[in-house]
Curated annotation (Swiss-Prot):
GO molecular function: transaldolase activity
Protein name: Transaldolase
Biological or metabolic pathway of the protein: Carbohydrate degradation; pentose phosphate pathway; D-glyceraldehyde 3-phosphate and beta-D-fructose 6-phosphate from D-ribose 5-phosphate and D-xylulose 5-phosphate (non-oxidative stage): step 2/3
Positions of the catalytic residues: 126
Swiss-Prot/TrEMBL catalytic activity: D-sedoheptulose 7-phosphate + D-glyceraldehyde 3-phosphate = D-erythrose 4-phosphate + beta-D-fructose 6-phosphate
GO cellular-component term (any): cytoplasm
GO BP: any one term: carbohydrate metabolic process
SUPFAM superfamilies: Aldolase
């Protein structure tokens, strides 16, 4: 009998959500995703500290922002030596509400990759799914720079991304689950909210059906998982990005994994209506969704905090 990881691969592209090279070698994902928190975690480990030191010292006098981008690309290059597919590299979250600055920073990241001999087709630029971020992605996609819109918590965000023609979206599962569990308090019944009944799973499934219903080509990559049940309930999603801990658990557990999602599911939603992708509708609908608006803001704040910590590490190694 196959492992659950092997069985999952029959339905879904498996992506590693980590900056840990050794974990990638062991688990053999197709793609990999990184974010400021994962890179910060990696460079605090002895195995990866030399990459920070070498990058910082090689560019003494450059700004922390420039060193950070060079460090992200250094990680990305090594990741692409391990995975056969793509790596996602994130634009500084402090630019989440600045379309022009996001575009410029993304162009710079792609230029660094291309200077290192990495074709742009192997890189996804991660951008927060704010209105400004989505408009930046629209510009970048038109230039052939492929984007991964992250911190996505609701269908209106996904619809706006589709209208912008982005390559891929990363709707979050675990953070939606966290919000609903916290807000339910004593009324939360864990067993009743597992698998297909998990609010995070339901959100991604809704987005998946919407995309398939309207023939939207943007890829959907479920992200932010808290447990294996959430992963298995989304088998069949285009891609799933999973932590090494949960990938290992899947690899160590035998069992078949049936597809929970299929393209046909979207055609069953015959009454679905295509959402208005305009700015007013986007901001109104996001504001009315307490969970999505709160988790988007919180996610940006967390990434900004880790970006500042990374700046401090860079400065401590003489880069500023």
């Amino acid at each position: 009998m196959p492992s659950q990881l092997e069985a999952l691969r029959r339905h879904t592209v498996v992506v590693a959500d980590t900056g840990d090279f050794e974990a990638m070698r062991a688990l053999r994902p197709t793609d990999a995703t990184t974010n400021p928190s994962l890179i910060l975690k990696a460079v605090q480990q002895e195995a990866y500290r030399p990459l920070l030191v070498q990058t910082a010292r090689a560019h003494q006098g450059a700004s922390p922002a420039e060193i950070t981008d060079r460090l992200l690309v250094a990680f990305g290059r090594q990741i692409l030596d391990i995975v056969p597919g793509r790596v996602s590299t994130e634009v500084d979250a402090r630019l989440s509400f600045d379309t022009r600055a996001t575009v410029e920073r993304a162009r710079g990241l792609i230029a660094l990759y291309q200077a290192a001999g990495v074709p742009r087709e192997r890189v996804l630029i991660k951008i927060a799914s704010t209105w400004e971020g989505i408009q930046a992605a629209r510009v970048l996609q038109a230039e052939g720079i492929r984007c991964n819109l992250t911190l996505l918590f609701c269908l209106p965000q996904a619809a706006a991304c589709a209208d912008a023609g982005v390559q891929l979206i990363s709707p979050f599962v675990g953070r939606i689950y966290d919000w609903h569990k916290k807000n339910a308090g004593a009324e939360w019944v864990e067993d009743a909210r597992r698998g297909a009944n998990d609010p995070g799973v339901q959100s991604v499934s809704r987005i998946y059906r919407y995309y398939k219903r309207f023939g939207i080509e943007t890829e959907i990559m479920g992200a932010s998982f808290r447990n294996v049940d959430q992963i298995l309930a989304l088998a069949g999603c285009d891609l799933l990005t999973i932590s090494p801990e949960l990938l290992t658990r899947l690899a160590q557990t035998e069992g078949e994994v049936p597809a929970a999602l299929s393209p046909q599911a979207g055609h069953d939603d015959a009454d679905a209506v295509r959402l208005d992708g305009g700015e007013v509708a986007f901001r109104t609908q996001l504001n009315e969704d307490a969970m999505a608006s709160e988790k988007l803001s919180e996610g940006i704040r967390l990434f900004v905090a880790d970006a500042r910590k990374l700046d401090a590490l860079i400065e401590s190694h003489g880069a500023a």
